[in-house]
Amino acid sequence: MKLIILIIAVFFITSINGQSVSNLPIWDKQQATLNGDWLLSKNGSKSAIYITQNNKLVFSNGLVSRTFSLAPNGATVGLELLTNDQSFLRSVRPEGEVEINGMRLNIGGLTGQPIQNYLLPEWLETMKSDPSAFQLVNYAMTEVKARFPWKKRKEWMSKELPWPLPGKELVFTYKLNAAAITLIAAKYLKNENLEYLKAISAEVHYELYDGMPVFSKWIRIVNQSAAEITINTFKSEILAATESESAVDTKKKWELPNITVESDYNFGGMTNESLYRSSIAWNIDTLYKTQVSYERTTPCLLEAYPKYGPDQKIQSGQSFESFRIWELIHSSWDREYKSLEHRRMLRALAPWTTENPILMHVSGSQDEPVKKAIDQCVEVGFEMVIMTFGSGFDVENETPQNLDRMKKLADYAHSKGIALGGYSLLASRQVGGGDDVVMPNGMSPTFGNSPCLESKWGINYFRQLYNFYEKTGLDILEHDGSYPGDICISKEHPGHRGLEDSQWNQFQRITNFYKWCREKGIYLNVPDYYFLSGSNKTGMGYRETNWSLPRAQQEIIERQNIYDGTWDKTPSMGWMFVPLVEYQGGGDQATIEPLKDHLPHYAQRLANLFGAGVQACYRGPQLYDVPETKAIVAKWVAFYKKHRQILDGDIIHIRRPDGRDYDAILHVDPAGTEKGLLMVYNPLDIAITRTISVPVYYTGIKGAVKVQEQEDQSKISTIRIISDGLSDKATLTINIPAKGFTYFILK
């Protein structure tokens, strides 16, 4: 009888868009595994699906593979990093979970695994389907689709990047059968007719990208019944991962499995760590009774779910889609290597972050100062003007006079090849009138005060944003505070019903706008981690009051901020700040104006920033005041534009700035003509000579490297590379002038 059921189940799900499973290529792990380092390789393996000899489906690109059972139910039964033959899965769990009308339902999965420490293939043959779970009925594969439209601003990009990302999407469809509905009714003591559940399907979506060890996953619930349903909550990923360490004693900080997770449901911070407050958790696995931890507290169960709600009403004929997560499977614990893999993933998943315009923060929004800033930008090669905080720029002023004036300024800027926009404060302010967030007792808004985005004020504010940018043609918004994830228990706001749907609805409100901005080519500076929802840039990571310190101290701190911030960001993902005029105090000792009186310091700041490929908010009324100042600014802009591709590339960290000796970073781009650019700074009052081991592995250069000092064609030398894997190095002896710098181009 069991054999008959198994045969029926396999027969029922043996097609992909009508293609028989027998027509799929047979999985050969050894043949499929890609050799070489994906960070350096130009030709990544293509994503595809295969069938194993025992009818398991394999989704692989030669770097990683995820294996699925098809019967007696769908489930992830393998997750491997092929390049070092490492398994990341120890136990089978449901593919997801959804709570509909108060009933928690598993999507797929198998039960009956004898222990949770590891998974043997032969165990799968006797494991069973949960009879109350959604059952796999079909699967299909398509090309990866764009998450939303992106109007590329190629003038700010150093290289063309694809959108959508090349790869494949694999979709599994699950439904509830009559037996499951009977069990659900008994479990939840439901007397009403639950037949409508048969008309609800659960889709589990996966994406795998060509040439990257990255999977994406999300779920979609389709309501084809005649009834309205409520999605109370969900889990879009339940992954029982192999633990990275086992400890008997309880630890304050565990070594998590070597997987970096990203989510497009992320807010309230400038790094991806904030996702642990919004959408991701490494939880304790309560089924893992045989773990080493005495109190069984090893965090080795990856789960993706919103911390509140979403509590969404889904009408007949409509669907609900969860947020997406991405799982980067690492092959190394080396900090630089893991960081590079993460940065490469972000650049691919959010390619608009490679738009890196050279920008100025003009301190006034009236016609004269704005036009002066535009004209100066044209003269020295800057590409964008932002009417900064405190400038008087106001997107909430919808008077015909203001809209007309801003359109004329935008037209003027565009006629000169300059992008123009301004600053708007969203969070950290109180709007009153019952439109602020109402927090539960004992809780406060992230920034002390904040409007609810689903209040009348919030809904109108976003209407104003759409209207303002559509009518003026401005093409940059600096959106301060953004939405930090504040919940709201108000029952009076028109955009949400209460606590449980407040966070989800507010997030949808703001990210729908950000995605619209991407479609229109409107650049977004957002001091929050909204990259995967459309923002271009966030703060590199600095303390604002430091720009009130004496100028000499700012020089070192600036390079420290860049060094530290580029562990988890590319140079184009983070902005810095240059106070041309006083900012939060410090007086004459902190500011650069009058510019002509502080040329050495101004030049050093430009060298710090353009040498790192990092754009800053140069805040003030002007970029230059005399020809000598103009020449210095133009020199560094020209340097950046000449070497834009390599300077926009990833940074390898050599020596952190400490003011006591040299500091250095190495830009790398193995696909470029200039494969490396070494920037070295000397903060000391004396010239120094140093011998530096340059880590050239990430340049992709083998054998020997040609090194050119600055732009001097007569100073080219060939240096033998000492081969040592990730530690491949070329030894370089260099002279660095006092309070100066030098740079070297590697080919």
Show where each model-derived region lies.
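Hydrophobic faces of well-ordered beta-strands that scaffold small-molecule active sites
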Residues: 356-362, 385-387, 420-424, 477-479, ...
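Glycine-rich, aromatic-flanked loop segments that form ligand/cofactor-binding clefts
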Residues: 119-154, 328-342, 405-446, 470, ...
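C-terminal beta-strand-rich structural cap/linker in extracellular carbohydrate-active enzymes
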Residues: 722-747
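The substrate-binding groove and active-site-proximal loops of carbohydrate-active enzymes
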Residues: 356-367, 388-403, 443-462, 494-506, ...
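Active-site-proximal substrate-binding groove within the catalytic cores of carbohydrate-active enzymes
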Residues: 59-62, 510-716, 731-733
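Active-site-adjacent "subsite" loops/lids of carbohydrate-active enzymes
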Residues: 366, 404-411, 415, 419-474, ...
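An acidic-aromatic substrate-binding cleft motif
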Residues: 321, 335-384, 388-391
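Polysaccharide-binding surfaces and accessory modules of carbohydrate-active proteins
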Residues: 20-50, 55-58, 64, 75-298, ...
